[in-house]
Amino acid sequence: MAVTRTLFIEDHRPTLHLTLYEHSPQAPTVIFIHGMTAHAGFYSEMIPGANYLKALAEAGLNIIALDLQGHGRSGGARGSLTYADAMRNIRRAVDFALAHYHDRIGITGSSMGGILAFYAALEDERIRAAVCHNVLDLQDIRPVLYLRRHFVLVPLARALRPLLGILGGLPIPVRAFLEPSHVFEKPENLRRWRADPLCVWAYRLSTWISIFLEPSDKPPIEAMAKPVRLLVGEHDRILPADYHRGFAARLRCRKDLVVVPGAGHMLPLEYLELTVPLVAEWFHTHLGSI
């Protein structure tokens, strides 16, 4: 039985909200990073009977689910998050894990959270293993652009980079870059998502540019040295399976790619029973079983 509690990290600003699902003191400890718009509770409370975080804990993991700044119950301006902010937030979660558990720490994430989890594992030597539901080379996002509007808005955003000092706070709707109907397969889940009062539906121009359109502060993906498992749905339209095959082929570390047959984008919630064992098994293998 997993023990659940929530708390705030207040050692620095902004305050960060954590949701903990604890299995046992010696279980592998895994930090979870949510996707775009979302927060930790999105993966535990939004769909009745689909508590992904609890399921991971019941599979033998201690889960530290982080609300990135500007999201959920964490501090910071809504929709304001740079790549450097995200890496700092995750480092603070690792600090917490080391202070309260042990050093057998992994990281996992979904969608944008999978992308950020990959880079956090690459950059933070204390993270020993990763499972990423979706990845993307943030030095070059062009291979995954597929919506007609991408080919107008992405060049426009790049052109506005010199004006970030003036226009950086401009709110850009999530729908400009992400098609909501491609996230969930079930219409009722899409409705639940849209009704979630803690979700962020616009990001500042500076956020879009910092995370997706500024290659200079991103290390090459080939530098990854940790064992990493990549997960993707066979029919994911946002970050396709073929892209993940090419990404995995470039990695030099111990790696594994699992393409979930018949699945779309939202593996943690719409394919929970398939996803949880894939995540838990990797961490038990590379962080040690209880």
Regions found by a protein language model. Name each.
Residues 224, 230-232, 236:
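Short beta-strand/loop motif that positions the catalytic acidic residue
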Residues 51-75:
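Conserved alpha/beta-hydrolase
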Residues 36-51:
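The serine-hydrolase catalytic nucleophile loop
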Residues 226, 240-249:
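Short alpha-helix in the alpha/beta-hydrolase fold that links the catalytic acid
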Residues 112-197:
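Alpha/beta-hydrolase-fold enzymes
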Residues 72-104:
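Catalytic nucleophile-loop/oxyanion-hole region of alpha/beta-hydrolase
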Residues 263-276:
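Catalytic histidine-centered segment of alpha/beta-hydrolase-like enzymes
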Residues 1-23:
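N-terminal cap/lid segment of alpha/beta-hydrolase-fold proteins
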